[in-house]
Amino acid sequence: MASIRVADEPAFVLHSIPYKETSLILDVFTRQHGRMALIAKGAKRPHSVLRPVLQRFQPLLVSWSGKSELRTLTKSEWVGGMPSLVGDALLCGFYLNELLVKFLAREDDYERLYDRYSETINALSNLEFESKGLEEILRPFELSLLQETGYAAALDRCVETNDSPVFEALYVYQPERGVRPIQVDDPGHWPVLRGKSLLAIAAGDFSDPETLSESKQLMRFLLGLHLQDQVLTTRQILIDLKKI
């Protein structure tokens, strides 16, 4: 297999672990190549040019080479423009990273999801200036993640008829299928949503309090279906704190 070289690829660091005495193994989310495993040689050395750059939640341009699954980072440049995450916003950032690591296979490109992630991190980094709360910021990302990875069906069409939901009618989200009108014998744990909420969620509009509440129920259900018994540490903390 020929060695591959990639230059100046937009990326975010999701996670890093020490490797040998002076290096790091990075899990990075890139725009055109998806999740990549990169070794940053010498990044732990006190005077390494990489050390101050390889920070989570900061937009980077990274370059790498190699032909194995673990490529070698050859350059990393901080793009800038985003304040550091603090407080609840920092917890939410770790939550997003946990989701990406659990949901995304390596080296599958998700350009739209990358853009959504970048937008979400930017909104979290400017939380004090945002008119939206944490849940309004997080819900669109969760939905994008589920739909881009194939774990959520369309919300603006009924699975059996392909009709649009009726505003005041009630619907359930049936696992493995999608949205359909509610029935009396439906399991009680399936999410119940108004047609109005389904259409708003599909359009990315979470401004209505009832829609936001119903979207929370739906996202927890769909994420839980995929994660099953896996507990994401930051996600559980945010749930316990009633932040998401």
Swiss-Prot record:
GO BP, one annotated term: DNA recombination
Q: Which InterPro entries match?
A: ARFGAP/RecO, DNA_rep/recomb_RecO_N, NA-bd_OB-fold, RecO, RecO_C
**SUPFAM superfamilies assigned:** ArfGap/RecO-like zinc finger, Nucleic acid-binding proteins
Q: Which UniProt keywords apply?
A: DNA damage, DNA recombination, DNA repair
Q: Name one GO cellular component term.
A: bacterial nucleoid
Matching Pfam families, A to Z?
RecO_C (PF02565), RecO_N (PF11967)
Instruction: Give the stretches traversing the membrane.
Output: none
Q: Which HAMAP family match?
A: RecO (MF_00201)
The family assignment reads: Belongs to the RecO family.
* Summary of the function given for this chain in its UniProt record: Involved in DNA repair and RecF pathway recombination.
What is this protein's record name? DNA repair protein RecO
The species this protein was found in: Polynucleobacter asymbioticus (strain DSM 18221 / CIP 109841 / QLW-P1DMWA-1)
Q: What is the lineage of its organism?
A: Bacteria, Pseudomonadati, Pseudomonadota, Betaproteobacteria, Burkholderiales
Q: Which gene encodes it?
A: recO
